[in-house]
Swiss-Prot record:
Name of the protein this chain belongs to: U1 small nuclear ribonucleoprotein C
Key words, A-Z: Metal-binding, Nucleus, Ribonucleoprotein, RNA-binding, Zinc, Zinc-finger
Molecular function (Gene Ontology), one example: mRNA binding
PANTHER family associated with the record: U1 SMALL NUCLEAR RIBONUCLEOPROTEIN C
Biased composition, class Pro residues, residue ranges: 63-74, 84-99
One Pfam family it belongs to: zf-U1
Annotated function: Component of the spliceosomal U1 snRNP, which is essential for recognition of the pre-mRNA 5' splice-site and the subsequent assembly of the spliceosome. snrpc/U1-C is directly involved in initial 5' splice-site recognition for both constitutive and regulated alternative splicing. The interaction with the 5' splice-site seems to precede base-pairing between the pre-mRNA and the U1 snRNA. Stimulates commitment or early (E) complex formation by stabilizing the base pairing of the 5' end of the U1 snRNA and the 5' splice-site region.
Cited SUPFAM superfamilies: beta-beta-alpha zinc fingers (SSF57667)
UniProt keyword Chaperone present: no
């Protein structure tokens, strides 16, 4: 009778039957071995990706990513209009702090776009306040209570 070999545990089981395999596979030691195997596999995959990316970068296939705040290549960095000083000719004035930008000749934004929440179709910033998502806890109760199905000839408990 052939024996069952477990690659994760590097061991042979006493005999090849579904009940022995099921018992072995539900054991603590087997589960730890499986977890360790896939953990090592993921680490190898990540290291392989890092090595490939590093090699491509060193060969010049991947351009260096500019750091935030670094001047763009071949140009000078102009100060942002909101960093003090009067607006330059041809530029709109800086938006008020804490509010959305206003377009010229349009007046203030509608109430839905006031500070304190994102406007319609906009997401809150990363790390900002989380909005509640509708879910089972926010659903309305049924319009009428659900009654058990009654077969013809059976007596309903409420009558």
């Amino acid at each position: 009778m052939p024996k069952f070999y477990c690659d994760y545990c590097d061991t042979y089981l006493t005999h090849d039957s579904p009940s022995v395999r099921k018992t072995h596979c539900s054991g603590r030691k087997h589960k730890e071995n499986v977890k360790d195997y896939y953990q090592k596999w993921m680490e190898e995959q990540a290291q392989s990706l890092i090595d490939k990316t590093t090699a491509a970068f060193q060969q010049g296939k991947i351009p260096p990513t500019p750091f935030p705040g670094a001047p763009p290549p071949g140009g000078s960095l102009l100060p942002h209009p909101s960093i003090g000083g009067p607006p330059r000719p041809g530029m709109l004035p800086a938006p008020p702090m804490g509010g959305p930008p206003m377009m010229p000749m349009m007046g203030p934004p509608p109430h839905a776009m006031m500070p304190g929440g994102p406007g319609p179709g906009m997401r809150p910033p990363m790390g900002g306040p989380m909005q509640m998502m509708p879910g089972p806890h926010m659903m309305r109760p049924p319009a009428r209570p659900m009654m058990p199905a009654v077969r013809p000839g059976m007596v309903r408990p409420d009558r």
